């Protein structure tokens, strides 16, 4: 069988600069600006992983974000330590929480925030094994 490895997340945005600034402010993303095919491109690194931001032109046939919940890709998760402090920091920065911090089962604490373009982001802490 072939070997598969994780490569990236791809986000479409009407305002890539604002989207990148949000992830940088909220999650400490490293914003990487470059040129591709003569056009500006914005990518990010979050937790060592690649996140690409594709611009959505004003006049395009790209649909708006769906109403949640919906089928298909639901969210991506960012693991942290000291989640109580992280949640307090995110609230101080104005993050919009769609699910407050809770413990769905022993050893895991989670919450969800809504990012630009309606992207759902889980922030979680797993107890050491």
What do these predicted regions represent?
Residues 19-24, 90, 118:
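Conserved active-site tyrosine of GNAT-family acetyltransferases
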Residues 1-5, 30-77, 88-114, 126-129:
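Vicinal oxygen chelate
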Residues 123:
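Short glycine-/small-residue motifs
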